[in-house]
Structures are given as C-alpha cells and as structure tokens.
Amino acid sequence: MAEERKLYMCMRCGRVFSKPEMEILPGIRCPYCNFKIIMKVRSPTVKRIPAV
C-alpha cells in the first residue's frame, strides 16, 4: 500500500503543511504562525459509489 501524505491547513495564515512539518514544535500547532487551530485538508479525488 502506498504511503498517503496527509495535509493540514492553518486557520489563521492559510498555509498548507504536512505532519512532519507540524512536529517541529511541541504540541499541535502551525509551524509558521504558531496558531493552534488546524484543519485537515480533504483529498481532491471524488469517491464514487454505486446507487442502491
């Protein structure tokens, strides 16, 4: 299985970064502006399911 890279976005500065970048600082914070509120970015692919 290929390694999936999860991306996060800061709610203050709007920058997108990965988990290894986020682990530079202690705790869960934006590595650029040190803001605590972070959102996980959704994947750009659409998941299609058959209709019932």
From Swiss-Prot:
Organism: Pyrobaculum neutrophilum (strain DSM 2338 / JCM 9278 / NBRC 100436 / V24Sta)
Cofactor binding annotation: Binds 1 zinc ion.
Name assigned to this protein: DNA-directed RNA polymerase subunit Rpo12
Similarity comment: Belongs to the archaeal Rpo12/eukaryotic RPC10 RNA polymerase subunit family.
KW Cytoplasm (keyword) present: yes
Catalytic activity entry: RNA(n) + a ribonucleoside 5'-triphosphate = RNA(n+1) + diphosphate
Localization of this protein: Cytoplasm
Cofactor: Zn(2+)
